[in-house]
Amino acid sequence: MDFQTLHQLSKTELHCHLDGSLSLSCIRQLAKMIDRKLPATDDELRRLVQAPADSENLGDYLKAFDFVAPLLQTKKALQLAAYDVVEQAAEENVRYIEIRFAPVFSLAGGLSLVEATQAVIEGLHQGMATYDIMAKALVCGMRQLPNTDNQTMFKTTAPLLGSTLVGGDFAGNEADFPTNVCAPAIKTAQSLGVPLTFHAGECHCPQNIAEAVRLGIPRIGHATACFDQPALIEKIVETGTTVELCLTSNLQTKAARTLAEFPYQALKKAGAKITINTDNRTVSNTTLTQEYQRYQQAFGTTAVDFLAFNLNAIDAAFIPDADKKSLRDRLHQDYATYC
């Protein structure tokens, strides 16, 4: 399939970070709101908000987020940001997206956890009112923060769970804060009924994936380090765990130093539930269409595969069965021409 055909395909995305996916025009708009000077050209601005091509590791990659954080400190800024990411997704025919963010990073301007979360929800509503897309939010705990901080965040935002805020995640410095360190906050979120996904296996540490699966988390973000772990892959399949793959991001962070270290083929061969994601559209300088093209070029991924992965995403989405059915029906209809 050529790029235009890939663009036209209906898509779903489970793993997309708000702060890592703002368009350059949105970043300029947000900076203007706080009188922050930016480079005159987009090429110069990109160098500040995109991960360097020669990132040495995940920590190096995450530095690109520092530039955007001060721009997301008001309700209006968070609304605009959420709307912007929904708009980008809708423009490449994403029919369902879950956008994740850490409300704790938007408190410097005096917002509360609830106000920050509500602002993102409002931005998603505005996006859905404008575009043909279903957009949901996930709140992220940050593994480098004390468990008490993450527990407070989940306790505070759990009452907002409903039609738009649908779940939670843990992101951040995995190398120094492995899964078992986060276990108390994970268990708190689970006890509150927060559906969870979880970043694991992004730093050559398969034990973090295994521990997340053991804790009953139904979705794993990245899971890169399972590529040469057949017993772990078998456990992923056995438990029905869904994997949120992020190819471009993993190559940038060196979570996968080569395509051979990316787990797609091993997971697919084993029958695991795979989904395709951007992770961070801006930081990784990618789109979901570009990700599809990379899978097609690297692995020979077909329209039949893409449909299956999108159906996996709908199955794993934190939404009611009625919404899943309507999305599945639409995907089958939209892919009928290609499969």
From Swiss-Prot:
Similarity remark: Belongs to the metallo-dependent hydrolases superfamily. Adenosine and AMP deaminases family. Adenosine deaminase subfamily.
Positions annotated to bind Zn(2+): H15, H17, H199, D279
Catalytic residues in the record: E202 (proton donor)
HAMAP family listed in its UniProt record: A_deaminase
Protein name listed in UniProt: Adenosine deaminase
Pfam families: A_deaminase (PF00962)
Co-factor: note: Binds 1 zinc ion per subunit.
GO MF, one annotated term: 2'-deoxyadenosine deaminase activity
Keyword Glycosyltransferase tagged: no
InterPro entries xref list: A_deaminase, A_deaminase_dom, Ado/ade_deaminase, Metal_Hydrolase
GO cellular component: cytosol
Protein role: Catalyzes the hydrolytic deamination of adenosine and 2-deoxyadenosine.
EC number: 3.5.4.4
Binding site for substrate: H17, D19, G172
Reaction catalysis annotation: adenosine + H2O + H(+) = inosine + NH4(+); 2'-deoxyadenosine + H2O + H(+) = 2'-deoxyinosine + NH4(+)
Hydrolase listed as a keyword: yes
Site (Important for catalytic activity): H222
Example GO BP: adenosine catabolic process
Co-factor(s): Zn(2+)
Domain of life: Bacteria
Record keywords, A-Z: Hydrolase, Metal-binding, Nucleotide metabolism, Zinc
